[in-house]
Amino acid sequence: HSGATITLVPMDATTQTLLTHQDLTRLTACDHPLPQFVRETLRPWIDYSIRTRHLPGCWIHDALVIAWLLNQRVADGVDYHDDIELRPGATRGKTWRYRTPLRLDVGVPADAGALVHVMQNVNNPLLLEVIEQTFNGLKR
């Protein structure tokens, strides 16, 4: 209820990302300490994800958020009214969301909660391109 613009990036969105070993090699090819650190840090994580999640790489949750801040074409989303249940009882702490117009009574007053942009669809090739361009733009 702060009035701040909020974008929620749920796991449904971040699991649409994928970084493979081949991607990591290409993205971190420039000679700068930051991409080199990212390469060394992510290689074991990609291996772990391949073994445990049976994916061809790993998800890059935090990188998605930062890339989206740099280029909002990386992902799109939908606006929802969103809030957290604060009344005492079994549902306290539960989050809820709805889109207007709400067509049936669900015990939530109309226009309750804050308008929140919820990320839904990720353009993974563009995400990787934004990361690569950012790394390539680093000055030594």
Which residues are covered by each model-predicted region?
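Conformational coupling and interaction surfaces
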Residues: 3-140
